[in-house]
Amino acid sequence: MSLLLARAAVNDANIHFDRLYSYLIPAQLVGKVYPGSMVLVPFGRGNKARMAVVLAVEEAEETDAPQRLKSLYDAAPEEARLTPDLLELVRFLKERTFCTWFEAVKAVIPYGAQYRPAMVDGRPVMQSRLTRSTEKLYTLAGALPEKPKPGPRQLAAVEALKNGPLTARQLDEVGISRATLDGLVKKGILTAAEQDKALDLFAAIPFDPQPLTLSAEQQQVFQELLPSLEDDKPHAALLHGVTGSGKTIVFLRLIQRTLALGRRALVLVPEISLTPQMIRRLKSTFGSRLAVQHSALNNTERLLQWRMIQQGNADIVVGTRSAVFAPLQNLGLIIMDEEQEHTYQSESAPRYDAHDVAKKRAVMENALLLFASATPQTETYYAAKSGRLQLVELRHRYGGRPPPHVDFIDMRAELAAGNPREVSVRLARELQENLDNGEQSILLLNRRGYRTIGMCTACGHVLKCPNCSVPLVYHKPQHALLCHHCGHTVYPLPQTCPECGGKINYSGFGTQRVEEELAGLLPTARILRMDQDSPSRKDAHETMLAQFARHDYDILLGTQMVAKGLDFEKVTLVGVLGIDSLLFGQGFRAYESVFSLITQVVGRGGRAELPGRALIQTSVPDHPVLQLAAAQDYEGFYREEIAFRRFGLYPPFCSFVVIGFIGDQEGAVLIAAQRFGVLLGEHAAQKPDIPLRILGPAPMNITMLNNKFRYKLTLKCRNDAAFRALLHETLDAYDAEKLPQKASVILDFNSDGDL
């Protein structure tokens, strides 16, 4: 019998050692190790036990020198094995994002499904990171004999199981004891098997299917998408629908058809706060074969939900970015709602864009990928206009409702009139009118904290984080200064300047300050603040939104999490505060982000029978982006934006790649960035067919973060296989350089200009 080799990628290997290593498969593991298997291997001179993933299994050749190879220590059970599809996604992440093999593996499977090395009886073995929680599942295997006459509980058990298998817990709820079940198993009438304990996160949501009644426009969109859903080939489409046009009911109808075809559906949302609303619609319409994947679940919950999907017990999965890796088989439909949101891009390794992974999955599964938004990314809309995506549109609000009426409040005039508050006189008056009418309001301020800057009145010194090159923010509940990047805290609140002893003046405003101001202006108003500081429990967002939906609160004040996808029938007034700082932000997507944010939040008003209105506070009311957003004129904005992108050579007319350099010494980081740029230019000169512009090096927007200095090179390029090969060559050449101090290198292929 020939020897078998496993080609495996090892955990905790840095990028220089991240390659496939060959190990012998010992006799006791033959038949248990396949591509995708998680294994335990000896690594390095000390043969330290390391986790690894098998990428290939091959017969050993003489050239492999099998007598010199090490053997695998252990292999995980079959259930931990990556399916061929998931393994293909690991390869995809590795090739596209330049991450390590195991960084890709950890993105694809949840923490609880991973294993760790352990020692048992002096032998290295693999242990699950979480203790498995199981329960017995009973299945009817035969008929009850007529003699001896069966008892009433035995009859009840058999009757209950005629409609399908049930767990011991479910049978206990109808009065059937474990002793009765065990007796029937001994007689061969039932079979019992261990399965992962079921976790019904949505038990409180009733299954209450209602007819999915589409408007004529919605029905037309559904009919236009239907051929792409049914022909078992990969397709991609963009559903561009104005706010309040009823995109969700089109989703439900498409999912209904997908399930009727015997296939499964994946629904992606950009924020955890949007999952409860989507889950409620899906559970009430389609029942309990529904799973969720997002970071607010604890490790046990995520594992049980993941296993439910893996075992084929979920037909629909809803979740945030990481749900794009859900192990759904026979996937027929992928919906990416609010596709323009930056949260679909990972900010840590692997730095993937869920758009790219969803496209890959659609091709692998012959599925329909549907992007949806009222304000799609410029690149997505350009692709649709160019014919690379099918374009379907909902141009009218559901039920013929008019869009909210939008007015601007010039904050320069407000200040000149003697109002120093953050809430204008008119906004306060209209909030009071809503209170008097029993209606609700939403206020958007995309800035946390109480005061956003502390400055000395004598010398102008700004209080900054000692670890990061950013101002500290005053948070009143803690009576302390906080860094929103590293968490550094200064307590008690400084009153004098550390440089000259002068007085510190705190200015700027965040959600905490506006909440306090509203309480003074509207003493009877019930105000709910929703930002990253307010939730303390994992289900806090869901609880808050449910309270607001019940009208337990009159005003919902929050950051961008209140701007998208929420649907409250009594909200008739939307206010936008502090938008100017975003309008003049850095990055080529700044205008796109502001247009999207305003359009989305304005669209939260007037979604039922009551008309909506919106007030935008700004010092630049005539700015064209604000005017276009107020008019809900996406086409007009797109024409302006695509002209700017074409002139400046920004996506979609090139790929935008940022290479970051991070280290302890600023001078060394700058030298490393300069040297990398030179090497890249030299290698690119040998390949004139690869279009490339190298900009920089330059400091990142936040030059120091967590005591590390940060510089960047910006590349305008065509991100194809040839370009990525060029980057690999340059990285190898950089690694071979004899620099006094090297910097860590980070590549981001989906950047807006910074890391």
What does each model-identified segment do?
Residues V678, E682-L705, F709, V745-L755:
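A carboxyl-terminal module marker
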Residues N14, L522-A525, L680-R693, E737-K742:
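Short secondary-structure junctions
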